[in-house]
Regions:
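Hydrophobic helical h-region of N-terminal Sec-dependent signal peptides
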Residues: 24-29
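N-terminal targeting/tethering segments
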Residues: 37-148
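PPIase-associated folding chaperone regions across multiple families
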Residues: 38-40, 47, 143-216, 280, ...
Length: 419
C-alpha cells in the first residue's frame, strides 16, 4: 500500500483581486539560500509561436511552494518536495506537471481573448504594475532569486490570472448549469466504520494489523450488531463496543454521463463529518455521483434503507461498516450541493471549450529545461501574516463581485530575511 498524502489542487476560478492579495499579503523568509539560479529567459514551452519562459514557470512553482511549506513541513518534514506522495511522483514533480499544464491553460486563454471580447484595461494594467513593483521592492534579494521574480514576470503572471478570471466568467455564461432536485439531493446517515486490515499512523505511514488485532476489531463489530439486536441505538451500540458512530451526508444522484470505471475527473461533494477517504484496498467503485468518501457497498446499503432503518454488518476486503439512513433529503446539505453541482457543470463546460482550443494548438514542452527547476530550501510564513493574507484575500474576493479592477491597497511588505 502506498504512503499517499493528497496534493492540494490549485483553485481554477480564483478572482483576480484574490490572486493579488494572496500574492502580496504575507511575510516570507527563505532558509539556506543556495544561490543556484536558473536562466529566467530560457524557453520551457512553446504555444504555437509564443515562447513560455522558464522564469515564469519557476515563479509559479515557488509561489505555490511558499503557500504550502508551513503545512507540508509540519506533516512531512523538511525536504518534503523530494518525497513520493502520489503514485511514483514526488511533490516537486507533481508541482512541475501542474505548473506547465496551468501555463498551457493560461496562454491558451490569452490567445483566445478576442473570442469573448476580454481585455485587461489600462487601469488594471496600472494596478498590476504597481502591485508588482511593491512586491519586488518589499522582498529581499534571496526571496526574489529563489522565486526567479522580476517586474516583468510578476506582471505577466498577474495579467494571465486576471485574463483567466475574466475568460472563465465569460465562457460559463453559455453553460447549461441548471440543477434539478434529484441532482442536488443529499441524504444524511450515521455510520460505524471499523478498519480491520490496518490504519495510517500519525506520520501517515500505513500499519498493517496483526491477526490478533484484526480479531479484536471483528469482535467490536459483532458487539455492535449484538447491541443493535437488543434494541440499542447505533450510537449507544458503538459506544458500548468501544468505538464511535459518526454522521455524514452523501449525494444520491447517479450521473449517467460519468464513466463508472474512471473517477479521476470527479469531485467529491460528500461531507462526512469525521471520516477520511477509503484506503486503496477498499472496494470503492464510485458508480454514484460523488461518493469518493464512501465504499460503494455502503452507498448501496443506504439506498436500500428507509429513514431510521439500520443496515446489517457490511464487510469489504478491509473494513466493517454499519449504517443508518437518517434522512433521505438533508435540506442544508442539498442546497450546498446544488451550488457544487452547478459549479461542476460550469467547470465541465469551461474545460470542454478549453480542450477544443488546445486540440487545435501546437504545444511543446522542453523537458530538459523543466528539469532544471529544483528546490533546495523552503519559505516560512508567520501566523500573523498568514491570517492577514487570508482576510485580505477574502475581502478582495467579495469586493471583486462588483468590479473587475484589481486591488492592492491592503497589501503588506514581504520580508525575505534568512532564518
Amino acid at each position: 500500500m502506498s504512503d499517499t498524502i493528497p496534493i492540494l489542487k490549485r483553485i481554477d476560478t480564483m478572482k483576480a483581486k484574490k490572486v493579488i492579495a494572496m500574492l502580496l499579503v504575507a511575510t516570507l523568509s527563505v532558509t539556506a539560500f543556495t544561490g543556484c539560479t536558473i536562466n529566467k529567459n530560457a524557453t520551457v514551452a512553446t504555444l504555437d509561436k509564443e515562447d513560455i519562459k522558464l522564469g515564469l514557470v519557476n515563479f509559479m512553482i515557488r509561489y505555490q511552494e511558499a503557500g504550502y511549506d508551513d503545512m507540508y513541513i509540519q506533516y512531512m518534514g523538511e525536504g518534503y518536495w523530494d518525497k513520493t506522495v502520489s503514485g511514483n511522483n514526488t511533490v516537486l514533480e507533481t508541482w512541475k506537471k501542474n505548473a506547465i499544464e496551468e501555463a498551457h491553460e493560461l496562454y491558451t486563454l490569452k490567445a483566445h481573448q478576442s473570442d469573448y471580447d476580454v481585455a485587461v484595461s489600462d487601469d488594471e494594467k496600472k494596478e498590476i504594475e504597481k502591485a508588482a513593483k511593491k512586491f519586488m521592492k518589499a522582498n529581499s534579494d534571496d526571496v526574489i532569486d529563489e522565486m526567479s521574480a522580476t517586474q516583468e514576470i510578476v506582471e505577466e503572471y498577474l495579467k494571465l490570472r486576471l485574463i483567466k478570471s475574466k475568460m472563465y466568467a465569460a465562457i460559463i455564461k453559455n453553460a447549461d448549469s441548471s440543477v434539478t432536485d434529484e441532482e442536488a439531493n443529499m441524504a444524511a446517515y450515521t455510520i460505524v466504520k471499523l478498519d480491520y486490515k490496518g490504519a495510517y499512523d500519525s506520520n501517515y505511514q500505513y500499519q498493517t494489523y496483526t491477526d490478533e488485532q484484526s480479531a479484536q476489531i471483528k469482535a467490536q463489530a459483532d458487539a455492535v450488531v449484538e447491541a443493535l439486536a437488543g434494541g440499542s441505538s447505533l450510537e449507544d451500540a458503538a459506544k458500548a463496543a468501544g468505538t464511535t458512530a459518526t454522521t455524514g451526508t452523501y449525494a444520491t444522484y447517479v450521473d449517467p454521463d460519468v464513466d463508472k470505471t474512471d473517477d479521476s475527473d470527479k469531485k467529491s461533494d460528500d461531507t462526512e463529518s469525521t471520516e477520511s477517504s477509503e484506503s486503496s484496498d477498499s472496494k470503492t467503485k464510485d458508480s454514484v455521483y460523488t461518493t469518493n468518501n464512501l465504499d460503494q457497498s455502503v452507498v448501496d446499503a443506504l439506498n436500500s434503507l428507509e429513514e431510521g432503518q439500520t443496515s446489517d454488518l457490511i464487510t469489504t476486503d478491509s473494513t466493517y461498516y454499519i449504517v443508518r439512513l437518517d434522512k433521505k433529503t438533508d435540506e442544508e446539505a442539498t442546497e450546498s450541493n446544488r451550488k457544487t453541482v452547478k459549479g461542476n457543470k460550469e467547470d465541465k463546460y469551461y474545460n470542454g471549450i478549453l480542450s477544443g482550443w488546445q486540440d487545435d494548438e501546437k504545444w511543446s514542452v522542453k523537458q530538459k529545461q523543466l528539469d532544471k527547476i529544483k528546490i533546495h530550501n523552503y519559505f516560512t510564513t508567520t501566523k500573523k501574516d498568514a491570517k492577514a493574507a487570508d482576510t485580505s484575500a477574502t475581502e478582495s474576493t467579495q469586493q471583486s463581485e462588483s468590479t473587475n479592477s484589481t486591488d492592492t491597497q491592503n497589501t503588506e511588505a514581504v520580508d525575505g530575511t534568512e532564518n
